[in-house]
From Swiss-Prot:
Biological process annotations from GO: integument development; plant ovule development; positive regulation of transcription by RNA polymerase II; regulation of cell differentiation; regulation of cell division; regulation of cell shape; regulation of double fertilization forming a zygote and endosperm; regulation of proanthocyanidin biosynthetic process
Keyword Acetylation in record: no
Protein name, UniProt field: Protein TRANSPARENT TESTA 16
Any one Gene Ontology cellular component term annotated for this protein: nucleus
Primary gene name: TT16
Source species taxonomy: Eukaryota, Viridiplantae, Streptophyta, Embryophyta, Tracheophyta
CDD domains: MADS_MEF2_like
Note: The two isoforms were always coexpressed in the tissues investigated. The pigmentation of the chalaza-micropyle region is not under the control of ABS, as opposed to the pigmentation of the seed body.
Domain MADS-box: 1-61
Length: 252
């Protein structure tokens, strides 16, 4: 009874795949050796496993490189030689050196060198190129300066806004302190109305606004800052008509 035919497809199980590879590699090398002995054939066998491990067999011991050279020569191919790589590298370096020298020679007139050997028409072209370059440089410089000016202007506006807010806060705080020090009872909305009016003025108009408020007799600032006109040493006495007409009180 013969063996069943095995379906040729990739073995998914890694362990089974490795076992099958090891067995069949051994069999392949055995058959290759037998073929080389029976038929006097020159055979080279190179096998890489799935993990990258190398296995090789050559019918002539230590002759694998010669066998590969023979294969390449037969097919019109050859392995790259290290000496050839050096020659190619030197050739490329020489080309780059020549190109660099040519570029340096072409740039010398732009630096004002070797102008005596340049004909007038080429000098005109050189002048136009330099003027165009100067124009480009000047445009870029103006762009950068404009950007700097815009940044400075933006910072100035921010500082002015911060200064205005600080100035407004200081005046509001001072007004609140004057109200507290005066100890004057105001109407519920009178102080808030005063603060709202104060916020509508610019920093330069604060002083004028405060002076106007102080000149008004009913102003909260006028009430808060008016000095006392009553002499603290003067004693007040209630008027009693009955006591003024009583003779007994006069004798006392």
């Amino acid at each position: 009874m013969g063996r069943g035919k095995i379906e040729i497809k990739k073995i998914e199980n890694q362990t089974a795949r490795q076992v099958t590879f090891s067995k069949r590699r051994t069999g392949l090398i055995k058959k290759t050796r037998e073929l080389s002995i029976l038929c006097d054939a020159h055979i080279g066998l190179i096998v890489f496993s799935a993990t990258g491990k190398l296995s090789e067999f050559c019918s002539e011991q230590n002759r694998m490189p010669q066998l590969i050279d023979r294969y390449l020569h037969t097919n019109g191919l050859r392995l790259p030689d290290h000496h050839d790589d050096q020659e190619q590298l030197h050739h490329e370096m020489e080309l780059l050196r020549r190109e660099t020298c040519n570029l340096e020679l072409r740039l010398r007139p732009f630096h004002g060198h070797d102008l005596a050997s340049i004909p007038p028409n080429e000098l005109d072209g050189l002048e136009r190129q330099l003027e165009h370059s100067v124009l480009k440089v000047r445009e870029r410089k103006n762009e950068l300066m404009q950007q700097q000016l815009e940044n400075l202007s933006r910072k100035r506006r921010m500082l002015e806004e911060d200064n205005n807010n600080m100035y407004r806060w200081l005046h509001e705080h001072r007004a609140a302190m004057e109200f507290q020090q005066a100890g004057i009872d105001t109407k519920p909305g009178e102080y808030q109305q005063f603060i709202e009016q104060l916020q509508c003025y610019k920093p330069g108009e604060y002083q004028q606004f405060l002076e106007q408020q102080q000149q008004q007799p009913n102003s909260v600032l006028q009430l808060a800052t008016l000095p006392s006109e009553i002499d603290p040493t003067y004693n007040l006495q209630l008027a009693q008509p009955n006591l003024q007409n009583d003779p007994t009180a006069q004798n006392d």
